[in-house]
Curated annotation (Swiss-Prot):
Keywords: Signal. One of its GO terms (biological process) is intermembrane phospholipid transfer. The keyword Disulfide bond does not apply. It comes from Rickettsia typhi (strain ATCC VR-144 / Wilmington). This is Uncharacterized protein RT0044.
Amino acid sequence: MRILIILSIILCSFFARADLEYIDNDIYNYNGGRNENGCLEVYDPYEKFNRKVFAFNSVLDHIILRPLAVGYKNITNDYIKARVNSFVSNVYTPLTAVNYGLQLNYDKTIKSVWRFLINTTLGIGGLFDVASKVGLQSDRQTFGSTLAHYGVAPGPYLVLPIIGSTNARDMTDSVITNYAINPLMYYTHNDFDLGILAISKITDRYVVLPFSDYVMKNSTDPYVAIRSALHRTREASVQYPENFKCPKPKN
């Protein structure tokens, strides 16, 4: 059973990226201009390799992950989806607190800790987002966000077998890294941790169903469309140091 759970988590990584939660599925506006000093141009020196892996991952997504996301969409109502999203978000809040601590942003570190404590207790294990109602909003941070905070540019765009789309900097946001530095994971059973990871990937994939379906059916080049969307939305979600300038790729 544990092997099946692990395989499910791995196979749920193709399109399911937390970065995509920033995409507006209604208007398909992928302009990441909110971060004016970010790296808005994609650096893709390995495009030939990336396209081959993208095609491979797309087939597996069509066979495995997309059906799971569609099933989740069909068998759960909006209330259940909201509870699942709130619960998963709460599990990853300690990870956000750790990364804010690494960024020396102690105000947001403390707020993240309070958010976790409030939602875990008053929110019944995180099923309800009580903290947002008292001004403690969700603001997910990853180790890639922390690296960006210290001026690390995204680097080359990469599409890895099974892992999916990422870049040199955000490879640190793999399942293994986020799993390792989330303090909550050290106090819970392994099967629980794996289950949370699998559920989070399925819900992430559900969120981007309108986007991915639209691109696959209408885009003349789905690879470019998805690459642009992932890159720009990720750049819009990180905060670079003041006066940061994206380095120009070497020819």
